[in-house]
């Protein structure tokens, strides 16, 4: 290995991980309360539905868009009437340097959604409040655990598809 190659290899090994927020924005939002105002005359025993998903797209070298999709729906336990449905797509553009492969996947699936989630949670809370429903405080989400579950499911699927060796 030449001296120039050694310097380049050392520089690459020492390239620090960098995560920068370029922009955070609302990509899509919807709030529906189809049974207002009659639902206010019913006893408030809500059943909460919560769905969460992420989507990532590479925009340029080291530049990624991450979109956090959250769908919250509430029905009343006794009547089954829908109180409200709130859908939010909270997005951000991030510069990510110094990592690749599984580390990059982890950053996009965990660290970036961790940045976006408080914005989405506050927006959902505000929309529910403006619908004059009781306060809704969504619990924190462990995106690291969700990513690990995803990796385990992927590994299990690959093992199930692999031919048996006798």
UniProtKB/Swiss-Prot annotation:
It comes from the Bacteria. Keywords: Chaperone, Cytoplasm, Protein transport, Translocation, Transport. It is found in: Cytoplasm. InterPro entries: SecB, SecB-like_sf. GO terms for biological process: protein folding; protein tetramerization; protein transport. One of its GO terms (molecular function) is unfolded protein binding. Coiled coil: none annotated. Transmembrane segments: none annotated. The keyword Repeat does not apply. CDD domains: Translocase_SecB. GO terms for cellular component: cytoplasm. Homotetramer, a dimer of dimers. One homotetramer interacts with 1 SecA dimer. NCBIfam families: PRK05751.1-4 (NF004393), secB (TIGR00809). Belongs to the SecB family. One of the proteins required for the normal export of preproteins out of the cell cytoplasm. It is a molecular chaperone that binds to a subset of precursor proteins, maintaining them in a translocation-competent state. It also specifically binds to its receptor SecA. This is Protein-export protein SecB. It comes from Actinobacillus pleuropneumoniae serotype 3 (strain JL03). The gene is secB.
